[in-house]
Amino acid sequence: MTATSDLIESLISYSWDDWQVTRQEARRVIAAIRNDNVPDATIAALDKSGSLIKLFQRVGPPELARSLIASIAGRTTMQRYQARNALIRSLINNPLGTQTDNWIYFPTITFFDICADLADAAGRLGFAAAGATGVASQAIQGPFSGVGATGVNPTDLPSIAFGDQLKLLNKDPATVTKYSNPLGDLGAYLSQLSPQDKLNQAQTLVGQPISTLFPDAYPGNPPSRAKVMSAAARKYDLTPQLIGAIILAEQRDQTRDEDAKDYQAAVSIKSANTSIGLGQVVVSTAIKYELFTDLLGQPVRRGLSRKAVATLLASDEFNIFATARYIRYVANLASQQDLRKLPKTRGAFPSIDLRAYAGNPRNWPRDNVRALASEYTSRPWDDNLSPGWPMFVDDAYATFLDPGMRFP
């Protein structure tokens, strides 16, 4: 036995006048697990005494059960298999388990496995520990009012009013505009921002803690976006500044209303193929290019539904890694192209060096950044360019390279 297992058994035990685990007791159980220095020994002791199954059966409601499951999955190693088996047995009389609300797309065991894989990846890739974090924006509408600015997760936004849903279905111009990208003239928007405004936006984006669906899978508080971007940059031989620039550009042209529309459409009966989250990753792109490969093992990825993929894209760490992995894919693809067959690209970006894309962006000509920005948002290297977007991303990149920019 351990001190934590003794405490947990006392909190989940029933008596003649105590036939349920209260919310307060459940929170004490979860806190004990999260603060335990020997979690594997505690799980082994609970398993040996027959209390491990009871733990999973008795701690609720679903949001607290998920917190419990994530805390155990993220902290165990030697005893993770035993914990998973106990969880399976606990679901015999409650097959839905934690599948409520947005979690309907994740069977309880899948949720356990995602938390376990994420915790392992965070430790392996160096973004498990929390870092210094900044303050979110309070903007609720207009440019730069989506998750990148506010930290409000798309899955937490209210359902779009039924009247607006009908108007969107009928393509009412005013309603479509309300739920679409807010910027028309990208250059005009940038001209309204001072250098300090741009720095403030960039710092707001990267300084916040990640907006994650799996906070309890981390050993402490979730890490900052800057920390996750830095980890993704190391993994894919990129720079955090390039990842940050791509995301900042996407988030400048994003609103809270559009976040709501894109996510809710993706998980609706239509399963719309929308772009979701920080890097505005398209659901089909995440699936086709297996953009979660470095955070989730193949068994988990293979079992994800399309709506589960859409939901994971709303979680910052998954979106940042998906964005970075796709940037690297587009860059590697460029290094294999023949510039003579891309006359429009060569004309628009005269300093482009396709071979340089195989290496780190620190060694790219600036035109490489601009060209990649165009190809990130469309079919890559088909010689059809995205008007205005290369310079829009380049402006964000310049902000991240500014000496006044603090990248935690």
Curated annotation (Swiss-Prot):
Binding annotation for Ca(2+) 1: 181, 253-254, 258
Enzyme Commission (EC) number: 3.2.1.17
SS bond partners: none
Entry binding sites for Ca(2+) 2: 375, 378-379, 382, 384
Result of altering residue 262 to A: Complete loss of enzymatic activity
Gene Ontology CC terms: extracellular region; host cell membrane; membrane
Subunit structure: Forms a heterotetramer with Tsi3 consisting of two Tse3 dimers and two Tsi3 dimers. Formation of the complex inactivates Tse3 enzymatic activity.
Functional note: Toxin secreted by the H1 type VI (H1-T6SS) secretion system into the periplasm of recipient cells. Degrades peptidoglycan via muramidase activity thereby helping itself to compete with other bacteria. To protect itself, the bacterium synthesizes immunity protein Tsi3 that specifically interacts with and inactivates cognate toxin.
Effect of mutating residue 250 to Q: Displays significant diminished activity
Activation/inhibition comment: Enzymatic activity depends on membrane binding.
Protein's organism: Pseudomonas aeruginosa (strain ATCC 15692 / DSM 22644 / CIP 104116 / JCM 14847 / LMG 12228 / 1C / PRS 101 / PAO1)
Broad class of the protein's primary localization: host cell
Record's subcellular location: Host membrane; Secreted
Highest taxon above the source species: Bacteria
GO molecular function: lysozyme activity; metal ion binding
Entry keyword annotation includes Calcium: yes
Effect of residue 18 to A: Significant loss of membrane-binding affinity
Result of changing residue 25 to A: Significant loss of membrane-binding affinity
Gene3D superfamilies: 1.10.530.10
Protein's recorded name: Peptidoglycan muramidase Tse3
Catalytic activity: Hydrolysis of (1->4)-beta-linkages between N-acetylmuramic acid and N-acetyl-D-glucosamine residues in a peptidoglycan and between N-acetyl-D-glucosamine residues in chitodextrins
